[in-house]
Amino acid sequence: MVVKAAGLVIYRKLAGKIEFLLLQASYPPHHWTPPKGHVDPGEDEWQAAIRETKEEANITKEQLTIHEDCHETLFYEAKGKPKSVKYWLAKLNNPDDVQLSHEHQNWKWCELEDAIKIADYAEMGSLLRKFSAFLAGF
């Protein structure tokens, strides 16, 4: 059975440059990802993405412009089980400070190449490149 999760790849525009928000997990190996989490019973991926972003970074749907037509699903193994994570691209309209939950210990705004390096796995790099290309044509 595939474990389903969802999240938002949040970006901001600062001095004409695009930066992506990454959160660092509180538990080893302390990986960096956009806000995301498991889909709860009775929820769809969209609802989970919105809820998890609020829980993990204290960013609400009202603070975002979500590009509903720009989304991608990643598939990989986590803890020996197949997992899918659907991400939508979202702009933070007023980039206030992020407020982390206990699940994360740090956060960063990163330009594309730095975000790819810090996320440190190929699928996330491909996703960030795809979303960056979408924004270049937006």
From Swiss-Prot:
Q: What is the effect of changing residue 83 to M?
A: Increases substrate binding and reduces catalytic activity
Biological-process GO terms, alphabetical: ADP biosynthetic process; AMP biosynthetic process; apoptotic process; ATP biosynthetic process; diadenosine tetraphosphate catabolic process; ribose phosphate metabolic process
Indicate which residues form the motif Nudix box. 37-58
Give the record's keywords alphabetically: ATP-binding, Calcium, Cobalt, Hydrolase, Magnesium, Manganese, Nucleotide-binding, Zinc
What is a single molecular function from GO for this protein? 5-phosphoribosyl 1-pyrophosphate pyrophosphatase activity
Note on cofactor: Divalent metal ions. Mg(2+), Co(2+), Mn(2+), Zn(2+) or Ca(2+).
What does the entry's domain section say?
Mutagenesis suggests that interactions with P1- and P4-phosphate are minimum indicating the enzyme may have a wide substrate range.
The record's family statement is:
Belongs to the Nudix hydrolase family.
Protein name according to UniProt? Bis(5'-nucleosyl)-tetraphosphatase [asymmetrical]
Give the organism the record lists. Caenorhabditis elegans
